[in-house]
């Protein structure tokens, strides 16, 4: 997404996504492409995207000032999510 100017990574969100076997680099790749983004609740955004290696990721993030985002969680898409994303 061209408007992203940076990511806010800290021990907490890196540890959280690593429990889902996802790396910060994968999240950045998935969001750098052409993800499907939906507005969630409480200022959150839900993004469905793909890494350069083809892995489908679901990411939840919040937008911060200056075009930076803080990832709250990320995981592999379910089969149902992949099917919807491909359409």
Q: Residue ranges of each PLM-predicted region?
A:
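Ribonuclease/tRNase effector modules and their secretory precursors
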Residues: 1-87
């Amino acid at each position: 997404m061209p408007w992203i100017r940076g990511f806010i990574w800290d021990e907490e969100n890196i540890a959280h996504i690593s429990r889902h076997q996802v790396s910060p680099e994968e999240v950045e790749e998935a969001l750098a492409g052409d993800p499907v983004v939906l507005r969630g609740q409480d200022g959150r955004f839900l993004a469905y995207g793909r890494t350069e290696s083809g892995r489908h990721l679901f990411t939840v993030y919040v937008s911060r000032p200056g075009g930076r985002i803080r990832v709250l969680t990320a995981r592999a898409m379910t089969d149902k999510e992949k099917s919807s994303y491909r359409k």
